[in-house]
Every structure is written in structure tokens, then in C-alpha cells.
Design a protein with these regions (language model features):
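N-terminal catalytic or cofactor-binding beta/alpha core of small enzyme domains
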Residues: 1-137, 151-155, 176-183, 189-195
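Active-site oxyanion/phosphate-handling segment shared across diverse enzymes
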Residues: 134-167
Length: 195
């Protein structure tokens, strides 16, 4: 079997739950020919890529798929690019709020996902699933771990991707701005089966 390292984040800001980690927890341990290895990341600048690096060294996965939360869409978003910028609109869970800082000094401005995002989205759309391409993973900790993963694993066989998942109904006053966790998890399973 192939190995998939999949990550999600703890809650941050005003939220008491994070659908990215909820979804990771709800996924089965095996999907298609992937054996899933689950890892929770904290919303803290500067520390979480180290956890990913340790897990990658230990597991030698075929694919690294990181999940984050997106309050701006009910689609599942497959991000195409990570930028070399920390630019927080809100504090992390330790109160840090970096502003206009590079993630890697003198590093490339951006990296593209090594996961074949366009092919995956096209396939999901053919199945009428609410999956879309994202052209920014923001400048918060999602982007930081995505950028550092691509920076460190760009020339390896491991595929690296980032997926933003929508809020859950219990997190919003208007349920039309959210997607039930069961639906998100089912769509993620389809995406993983297609990698």
C-alpha cells in the first residue's frame, strides 16, 4: 500500500472546532490503496513544519496532504500555490502576529503544488462534486506549512498538496455558508482515491 500523511489544524481565533482536523479524524485509516497517517498541527507560527518533517522522515510517505479551514466558500478547495510570506490578519494561538515577513529568507517567491491539482479538480467536477481550484493559500499558518513542505520536498517523489475545507453548520449563523462534515469527508475520500 501507498502511504498518505494527512494533517489538519486545531481551532484558532473565535472558533472552538476546526473542520480540517475533524475531517481528518473522521476519515478511515485506509482509502483506496492508501494507508492514512494522521497528524494534528497547531495554529502556531514557526513550529508546525518540524512535526511534518519528523513524520515524513519516519514514514517516507508517497503523498503529503495538508488540510486547513476556509470560511469563504462551501467548496472543497485544492490550492495550487504557496507564497513566501507570513502576513497575519489575526494572532496565532500563542499571540504572534507576523507582518510582511518572508517564510524563508531569500527563498523563491512561490511554489506550485506537486500534487496534480488541475487533473483532480477536473475529475471531481466531472462527478458533479463541489471541488474547486484555489490560487492562494493565504498568508497564515496554512500557507506557511504548505510553502515549507514544497520548499523542502520539491525535488522528491512525494506529492505535496493543500486542501481548504469549508466551515461546518454549527460554526455559522447561516447554514448556507457551511457544509456538513459528513459531506466534506466523503468528498475528501473521493479526492484521495483519485490521487
Amino acid at each position: 500500500m501507498r502511504k498518505l500523511l494527512i494533517t489538519g489544524f486545531d481551532p484558532f481565533g473565535k472558533y472552538t472546532i476546526n473542520p480540517s482536523w475533524q475531517a481528518v479524524q473522521d476519515l478511515p485509516d485506509k482509502i483506496g490503496d492508501f494507508e492514512l497517517h494522521k497528524l494534528q498541527l497547531l495554529n502556531i507560527y514557526g513550529s508546525e513544519f518540524k512535526k511534518i518533517a519528523r513524520a515524513v522522515e519516519q514514514l517516507q510517505p508517497d503523498c503529503l496532504l495538508m488540510l486547513g479551514m476556509n470560511s469563504g466558500s462551501t467548496d472543497i478547495i485544492l490550492d495550487t500555490v504557496a507564497i513566501n510570506l507570513r502576513d497575519a490578519l489575526i494572532e496565532d494561538n500563542l499571540g504572534k502576529k507576523p507582518w510582511n515577513e518572508p517564510i524563508v529568507k531569500d527563498g523563491p517567491a512561490a511554489y506550485f503544488a506537486t500534487l496534480d491539482v488541475h487533473t483532480l479538480v477536473k475529475k471531481m467536477r466531472k462527478e458533479k462534486l463541489p471541488v474547486a481550484i484555489g490560487y492562494s493559500s493565504g498568508a497564515y499558518i496554512c500557507n506557511e506549512v504548505f510553502y515549507l513542505s514544497l520548499h523542502n520536498y520539491q525535488n522528491t517523489k512525494m506529492k505535496v498538496g493543500f486542501v481548504h475545507v469549508p466551515l461546518m453548520p454549527e460554526m455559522v449563523w447561516d447554514e448556507s455558508m457551511a457544509r456538513p462534515l459528513e459531506e466534506t469527508t466523503a468528498i475528501l475520500q473521493k479526492i484521495i482515491e483519485s490521487i
